[in-house]
Amino acid sequence: MTSDIEIARAATLKPMAAIAARLGIPDEAIIPFGRSKAKLSGDFIATLKDRPRGKLILVTAISPTPAGEGKTTTTVGLGDGLSRIGKKVAICLREPSLGPCFGMKGGAAGGGMAQVVPMEDINLHFTGDFHAITSAHNLLAALIDNHVHWGNEQQIDSRRIALRRVLDMNDRSLRNLVTGLGGPAHGTPREGGFDITVASEVMAILCLARDLADLEERLGDIVIAERADRSRVTARDIGAAGAMTVLLKDAFQPNLVQTLEHTPTFIHGGPFANIAHGCNTLVATDTALRLADYVVTEAGFGADLGAEKFFDIKCRKGGLEPSAAVLVATIRALKMNGGVPKDQLGAENVAAVEAGCANLGRHIENLAKFGVPVVVAINHFTADSEAEVAAVEAFCEARGVKAVLATHWAEGGQGTQKLAEAVSELVEGGSSRFAPLYPDDMPLVDKIETVAQSIYRAGSVVFERSARLQLERWQEAGYGHLPVCMAKTQYSFSADPALTGAPEGHELPVREVRLSAGAGFVVAVCGAIMTMPGLPRKPAALDIHLNAEGEVEGLF
């Protein structure tokens, strides 16, 4: 079987000027990074603000399993399929992180014949955006410690410094550290640590800012610490926002690449899908909507996390109105939700598929609560039987939703033409009545309970006393209008990853809350959330190397 990287390497790429021209972008508006990558200039983007927006299509998925659903692959395949049926289309994706690339995933640019290229460049350093975000974040961290060292004018309580440093790598040994050791000349000793770059609030801010002025304003709003009286200290208070914006100036410009079938693709930003909103940048999505008739994008994890945050955070912040949603499901993932162990997924089991469809049905119901019409994409694998596929189609038909078998991994855009036609029919039907789940003026506690009960079907929400008190303080301090960002396991509607299917009446614990004032949301932490991953026993890095011709191998 030909590997993803071999397929990508064999592809014939078009010059970036030709890809840009498909969206009406002039040569002078693109900033080339070699022959196969480019950025779009901010000056050109500013000229688009009065253009009408095209149609926005979200690709999301059922609850993810170790078996994999192929959301990015489907996003790419659908974009190519829409292009094949004559639509002017652009795709918007997140940038991959080096940490997972060398950890468990081994690459994240689609797969098979539904890929974005140049695959190895995208998965490795790309255009340097993550380096810029890491640098801006760590500049802020350095300025905090420097401020404390040189007199501490803002009276920062070093025990209550909230900001940790970041690195775009999985490294568990950096989670908890003591810094400032070695005597007075080397700083003030305190506990600290590192998070992975995609967990940085700077990343979330870059992905939600409208322009450079908004970016600088949001960076200044980051709450970095508290004083002894529990009053908040921001990045603006120590004068950090301007220099941080300078470091992010070029990174803020969207990146443009292409699929194997030359569909223009914006890959820009990549925030965590648990403690942040898990979507590509607002500026890339808005730019694509001003240039294309159809824009296909994705959100991290399953629809209970990714789609909810896409609707309640990104669409709310950006004034976006999605026209349709594509819910990706696989037969093997449905079997796992139906109770089949991973090592038995190859055998036909229609009963397990039917049982697992409870998870699919729950996501369909949830998407309907946002007023967005849905089509189900059955991402095809060779082990799928006709009877299993028919069971999913019948389940969806009984609920008034169309299910379409998609074979894009093997056939590219040709394998998604029927899906593209179904999506186009939904979009042109104009049936979307999008609305967020809750209003801005709902209290923070009520917002958390609304998501928990309406989307997760929790019977109750149990707040740690400290979390509830903190929410009340933020409500009084003027942060009550912010949306909430739920941080919980992606494997279940509950906080228990082992509770698959469609559980109801469970108890959702909220053990901690975090204020992301710059990004503009409040994080509710439900269960254990790791912001600096570790490498597995056999990391993907062990299989990545250069061959005799100097080409990268092992990136799947």
From Swiss-Prot:
InterPro entries in UniProt: Formate_THF_ligase (IPR000559), Formate_THF_ligase_CS (IPR020628), P-loop_NTPase (IPR027417)
Catalytic activity: (6S)-5,6,7,8-tetrahydrofolate + formate + ATP = (6R)-10-formyltetrahydrofolate + ADP + phosphate
Gene label: fhs
Family assignment from sequence similarity: Belongs to the formate--tetrahydrofolate ligase family.
Protein's UniProt keywords contain Lyase: no
Keywords: ATP-binding, Ligase, Nucleotide-binding, One-carbon metabolism
Kinase listed as a keyword: no
Residues involved in ATP binding: 65-72
Protein name: Formate--tetrahydrofolate ligase
EC number in record: 6.3.4.3
Pfam family, one: FTHFS
Gene3D superfamilies given in the database record: Domain 2, N(10)-formyltetrahydrofolate synthetase, Formyltetrahydrofolate synthetase, domain 3, P-loop containing nucleotide triphosphate hydrolases
Pathway annotation from the record: One-carbon metabolism; tetrahydrofolate interconversion
A molecular function (GO) term: ATP binding
GO biological process: tetrahydrofolate interconversion
SUPFAM superfamilies found in the cross-reference section: P-loop containing nucleoside triphosphate hydrolases
